[in-house]
Regions:
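Signature aromatic-anchored transmembrane alpha helix within multi-pass, membrane-resident enzymes
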Residues: 269-270, 374-400
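Short hydrophobic alpha-helices at membrane interfaces in multi-pass membrane enzymes
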Residues: 198-228
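Transmembrane catalytic cores of multi-pass membrane glycosyltransferases
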Residues: 63, 219, 226-330, 334, ...
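Active-site lumenal/periplasmic loops and adjacent helix-entry segments of GT-C-fold
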Residues: 33-187, 210, 235, 407, ...
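Start-transfer (signal-anchor) and selected internal transmembrane alpha helices
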Residues: 1-52
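Transmembrane alpha-helical segments
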Residues: 129-137, 176, 188-200, 243-250, ...
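Extracytoplasmic
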Residues: 242, 399-529
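Hydrophobic/aromatic-rich transmembrane helices and adjacent perimembrane loops
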Residues: 240, 347-385
């Protein structure tokens, strides 16, 4: 640094003193400010590693076979895929979303199968989710530890009974659900809420400002396109996303001049246009489809046991309501509860699918409150102690087995479901061939390898529900112990079935030839026709 000399009188003497004079920009010689990761970047990275390993360690189960089947059909024909589970046309199936089409394109380019693509999607969806959570919480508060606490609350504060469903992202359910479209849609929802909240509060960087002093229309159109994408990827998650948009705009938008209304109108119009222009299915027609309501009734059972730990966030949410009647998290929680209640009263139980996101206002309000700097008052200390105890209870009763291997488990934590693989059967059954199967696991898994089922187990708008029920009845009649050979032959010919995949409790028909069997489950693969 430059040096200057000054004279300081000490008594009668004058002494030359060396003084350093700071020069602007001198720190640039050392590279400027040293980058330091935020707490969320550190813990988020560790969480990403741990959950990705846990997800890869557990066999894919449940709906994964359905999503793998979707990838297989798109891999075979990207523009005109067949029905995900049957040898039928697939036009109108909502499974063929932009998310699935991108997976199908990747499968065609890489040569990977449906199961491998679904497996690879897990860490990518987790990345979208973690970045979305971080961005969303920063819109709620600048407190650096709030995103870390929000992630912990979202994954641990559920209940003491297992809640496992697509769209539920507790620590345990992440081991099976991360590869689903719902996980990606929830991550995109957090991003959409963050962008919506920032625009409503007029925060963040704005590249262009119009004559009215408001951000340009392009940003609002981009937000609308994001909501349209969520609607196509996972329509029921989009319902919760739209409720969040309403909550943040109603809570934080303070002026409603005509240019403001125009901009939010552009966002809504762009979302509708993006969804309407998708060629694979009509997403708006799903609003009148009640074929899956019956299977979602279970969502309303054991609600307290599955979700009561999230109620620890009620005091924090009440504080936000006391400070502002228009607080977005309060409005979002109220809107979600109203929709869930409507689903129960009306019999449209599919709306119960948003229960996982209904907990978010409770969990995130608690995280924001506990991220406040110290010293804490007595009430906040009590709330923090209760939240820590609740997290421990959730970890030890339900969630801990997701990340603690069985060999290292000292207390017998509940473990993720372990489904058998059907690669042994898929080696013999060609892609597109029709299989008649019974049991719980096989019909949900074998289509993911490429074969079709004579009777799809899940409803799909691409197949009339009466036709699906007729096929199920025919398969039931085929597998009946009292069926005759002529009756079985007629069913097999009707659906072009050439294979049987039967549990060890079923009798193999006399005309079938056993090709392979599983030592793990005792199931038998037999050739017919």
């Amino acid at each position: 640094m430059p040096q200057t000399y000054s004279t300081s009188p000490i008594g009668k003497a004058a002494v030359d003193t060396l003084v350093r004079r700071a020069v602007r920009g001198a720190t640039a010689l050392c590279g400027g400010r040293v980058w330091r990761p935020t707490p969320y970047q550190v813990f988020g990275f560790l969480f990403f590693l741990v959950i990705s390993l846990a997800y890869w360690a557990v066999p894919l189960c449940c709906d994964a076979g359905q999503h793998a089947a979707v990838v297989e059909r798109l891999k075979a024909n990207l523009l005109h895929p067949r029905h995900p589970m049957a040898d039928l046309p697939g036009a109108g199936s909502p499974y063929y979303s932009p998310y699935a089409v991108s997976q199908g394109a990747f499968a065609r380019l890489s040569g990977l199968g449906g199961w491998e693509v679904v497996r690879l999607a897990g860490p990518l969806n987790l990345l979208v989710l973690l970045t979305g959570i971080g961005r969303f919480v920063r819109v709620l508060t600048p407190r650096p530890w709030a995103p870390v606490l929000a992630l912990g609350a979202m994954t641990l504060l559920w209940g003491t009974e297992r809640a496992w469903w697509s769209g539920y992202l507790s620590l345990m359910s992440m081991t099976g659900n991360l590869g689903y479209p719902s996980a990606c849609a929830i991550g995109l929802t957090f991003w959409a809420w963050a962008l919506t909240g920032a625009r409503a509060r007029r925060e963040g960087l704005v590249r262009y400002v119009g004559p009215s002093g408001l951000p340009g229309l392009a940003g609002y159109a981009g937000i609308g396109a994001l909501y349209g994408l969520i609607l196509l990827v996972h329509p029921i998650t989009a319902v919760a996303a739209v409720l969040g948009a309403v909550a943040f705009v109603a809570g934080w938008q303070r002026e409603w001049r005509s240019p403001v209304v125009l901009r939010w109108g552009v966002a809504a119009g762009t979302a509708a246009l993006a969804a309407w222009s998708w060629p694979y299915f009509d997403v708006f027609a799903l609003a009148a489809d009640d074929s899956v309501d019956w299977m979602h009734r279970r969502l309303y059972e054991q609600l307290f046991g599955q979700f009561w730990l999230a109620l620890l966030g009620l005091p924090a949410l009440w504080l936000r309501w006391r400070n502002s009647r228009r607080d977005p998290l309060v409005l979002l929680f109220a809107l979600d509860c109203l929709l869930v209640a409507f689903g129960w009263v009306s019999g449209h139980y599919t709306y119960g699918r948003i229960l996982g996101l209904t907990l978010v206002p409770l969990q995130f309000a608690l995280a924001v409150e506990l991220a406040a700097p110290r010293p804490w008052g007595r009430a906040r200390r009590a709330l923090g102690g209760a939240a820590a105890a609740g997290a421990c209870v959730g970890f030890l009763t339900v969630q801990g087995g997701a990340v603690v291997p069985r060999v290292l488990d000292p207390v017998g934590l509940e473990q993720p479901s372990l489904w058998p693989s059907y690669a042994w059967a898929a080696r013999h059954v060609g892609k597109g061939e029709v299989v008649i199967s019974d049991g719980h696991f096989a019909p949900r898994s074998i289509p993911g390898y490429g074969p079709n089922l004579a009777a799809p187990i899940w409803p799909d708008p691409a197949l009339d529900e009466r036709e699906r029920e007729r096929r199920l009845a025919d398969v039931h009649a085929y597998l009946s112990p009292t069926s005759t050979r002529a009756e079985r032959t007629a069913v097999a010919r009707r659906y072009h079935a050439h294979w049987l995949l039967l549990t060890r409790w079923k009798r193999v028909p006399e005309e079938a030839v056993i090709v392979a069997w599983s030592p793990e489950t005792g199931e038998v693969l037999a050739r017919i026709g």
